[in-house]
């Protein structure tokens, strides 16, 4: 630069030209590599899309489609067992409940329902949960103390969840309180049907024969249980047809369970899910049996009627024992 006293200023122009040329060359290389990066990204995305389409294709293949149809039909049959009480409970039961004789007949049904609920929890749900945790143990060595404690915690979680729900939706009126107990029973039934859907679909994934046997076994087990649930809904203030429709709505849980089991396509995934769903459902049924049903039976002061209630409670347990023996 003219007039500048610095000795290095004369070299500033060539240095600036050199740095500019170097920057342009680097930008050119980077620009040339962008199509390659874009092509690599496109190829990766294509591979992911192909894998996803292959997984969906395997899920909806001919063999899987048969499993889908059989599992959904089996779960739907289990859900439709909620209509069975309409064939057992008299048509005039809804109007009879307002009379003293009708109230006594309802308490008889509730006694049987209480036995069925207790039998379902201690003879079916909890043993199934123990079996699932044993099969999930490494080497099939049985349950550890930690696994047993986890089962107990899930039972407590079910009880506390249903307690919280009843506290949230509890009405100050007695009628509202009864209806809340009915809806809680429907929630427990929906979760229970979810586990049935898991079992049905997992069995059909093995073979059609095992799937059919499992479906029939669950149907036989559910029939006395549905009668008890129907009695609980009648106690909650629903008429026969409303109770039947609400019972049928719980079949959605079975369809969801079947769909979940088929989508996972893994017996391990089904076992891990059932290992906590079953004890959680047990806690819900225990809450309904001991908090909503048992207090009604404790109000009875007549010794002869109290004895009849106790015998019907035992009959409900015996029926669940017999069905458990036949199923096993």
From Swiss-Prot:
It is found in: Golgi apparatus membrane; Cytoplasmic vesicle membrane; Endoplasmic reticulum membrane. Its main location: Golgi. Homodimer. It catalyses: Zn(2+)(in) = Zn(2+)(out). GO terms for cellular component: cytoplasmic vesicle membrane; endoplasmic reticulum membrane; Golgi membrane. This is Zinc transporter ZIP13. Keywords: Cytoplasmic vesicle, Endoplasmic reticulum, Golgi apparatus, Ion transport, Membrane, Transmembrane, Transmembrane helix, Transport, Zinc, Zinc transport. Functions as a zinc transporter transporting Zn(2+) from the Golgi apparatus to the cytosol and thus influences the zinc level at least in areas of the cytosol. May regulate beige adipocyte differentiation. A motif (XEXPHE-motif) lies at residues 221-226.
């Amino acid at each position: 630069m003219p007039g500048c006293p610095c000795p290095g200023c004369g070299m500033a122009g060539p240095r600036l030209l050199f740095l500019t040329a170097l920057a342009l060359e680097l930008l050119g290389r980077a620009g040339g590599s962008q199509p390659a990066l874009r092509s690599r990204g496109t190829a990766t995305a294509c591979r992911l899309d192909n894998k996803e389409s292959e997984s969906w294709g395997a899920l909806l293949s001919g063999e899987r489609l048969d499993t889908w149809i059989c599992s959904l039909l089996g779960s739907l049959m289990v859900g439709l067992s909620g209509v069975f009480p309409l064939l057992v409970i008299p048509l005039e039961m809804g109007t009879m409940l307002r009379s003293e004789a009708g109230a006594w007949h309802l308490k008889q049904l509730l006694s049987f329902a209480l036995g069925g609920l207790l039998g379902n929890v201690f003879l079916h749900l909890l043993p199934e949960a123990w079996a699932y945790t044993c099969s999930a143990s490494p080497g099939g060595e049985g349950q550890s103390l930690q696994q047993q404690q986890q089962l107990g915690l899930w039972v407590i979680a079910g009880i506390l969840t249903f307690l919280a729900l009843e506290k949230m939706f509890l009405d100050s009126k007695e009628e509202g309180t009864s209806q809340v107990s009915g809806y809680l029973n429907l929630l427990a039934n929906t979760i229970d049907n979810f586990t049935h859907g898991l079992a049905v679909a997992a069995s059909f994934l093995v073979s059609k024969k095992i799937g059919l046997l499992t479906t029939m076994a669950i149907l036989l087990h559910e029939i006395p249980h549905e009668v008890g649930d129907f009695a609980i809904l009648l106690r909650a203030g629903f008429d026969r047809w409303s109770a039947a429709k609400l019972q049928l709505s719980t079949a959605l849980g079975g369809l969801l369970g079947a769909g979940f089991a088929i989508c996972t396509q893994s017996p391990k995934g089904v076992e891990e899910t059932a290992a906590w769903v079953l004890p959680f459902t047990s806690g819900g049924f225990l809450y309904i049996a001991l908090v909503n049903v048992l207090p009604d039976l404790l109000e009875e002061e007549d010794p002869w009627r109290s004895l009849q209630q106790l015998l019907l409670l035992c009959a409900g347990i015996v029926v669940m024992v017999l069905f458990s023996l036949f199923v096993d």
